[in-house]
């Protein structure tokens, strides 16, 4: 088969075309195949593609609010941790024990969304690309014979194609993924990769910040806030769209008073804007 011949370095691939290799090409191909690349580096590149190209939002907008979230691939954090909600992708490199239904539902309970990537060749494509890049970096290519330089130039072009294939395969892997949030396996059938992640995050936010729906009307400007604080915006209790939210604030203040604890506006904001 073609895979067996490639594994034995008898043939090479250029795009969708396979060619028999010369002795020199076989030697270089063999050295590339024997080049070791770190799993963590591959996972890091997966994270760059997912969070840098496919889903590059740093915050998720729900209604009129923006919610920051931590970005992870397997057990590797991407970017700066916020300590709040988390969006995590599990790749082909993750341990199989992490992908059992029980483990996924248990791990996502609380404030995490987990996306178990579908079975596409994104990992193999990135690994092949990284082997070529590392091999070239370790060689003094300019001092090699022209024939070898030409071969390596072709390999570098192939590496770029592998990277493009990996990006496309990752999109497909998300579209065919399994989605979990707050302890539930979500049934998300429609939408592209970004839309499916959005649906997962929407479910997570609505369950983590379970009191968001208490707010019936947002104050969008400083003038609206001042009108409320000064009493200029008078609304009867029965018609107050925020009466449930106000009751939650009052309950918190009463509990603080019972404990004889001083409470600042910053305390109120911290309490009511953090994860319950």
Give short role names for the model-derived ranges:
Residues 1-276:
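Extended alpha-helical interface modules used as scaffolds for assembling large macromolecular complexes
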């Amino acid at each position: 088969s073609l895979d067996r011949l490639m594994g034995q370095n008898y043939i090479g691939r250029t795009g969708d075309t396979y060619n028999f290799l010369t002795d020199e090409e076989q030697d270089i191909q063999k050295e590339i195949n024997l080049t070791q690349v770190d799993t963590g580096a591959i996972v890091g590149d997966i994270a760059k593609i997912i969070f840098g190209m496919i889903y590059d939002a740093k915050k998720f907008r729900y209604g009129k609010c923006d919610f920051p979230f931590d970005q992870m691939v397997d057990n590797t954090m991407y970017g700066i941790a916020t300590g709040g909600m988390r969006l995590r992708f599990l790749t082909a490199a993750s341990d199989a024990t992490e992908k059992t239904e029980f483990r996924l539902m248990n791990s996502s309970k609380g404030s995490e969304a987990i996306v178990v990537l579908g079975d596409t060749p994104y990992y193999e494509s990135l690994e092949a690309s990284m082997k070529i890049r590392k091999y070239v970096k370790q060689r003094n290519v300019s001092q090699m014979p022209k024939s070898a330089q030409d071969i390596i130039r072709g390999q570098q072009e192939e590496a770029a194609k592998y990277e493009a294939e990996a990006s496309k395969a990752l999109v497909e892997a998300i579209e065919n993924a399994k989605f979990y949030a707050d302890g539930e396996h979500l049934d998300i059938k429609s939408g592209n990769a970004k839309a499916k992640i959005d649906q997962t995050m929407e479910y997570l936010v609505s369950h983590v910040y379970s009191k968001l729906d208490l707010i019936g009307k947002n104050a969008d400007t400083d003038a609206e806030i001042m009108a409320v604080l000064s009493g200029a915006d008078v609304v009867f209790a029965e018609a107050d769209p925020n009466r449930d939210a106000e009751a939650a604030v009052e309950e918190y203040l009463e509990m603080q008073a019972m404990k004889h604890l001083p409470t600042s506006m910053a305390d109120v904001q911290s309490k009511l804007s953090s994860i319950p």
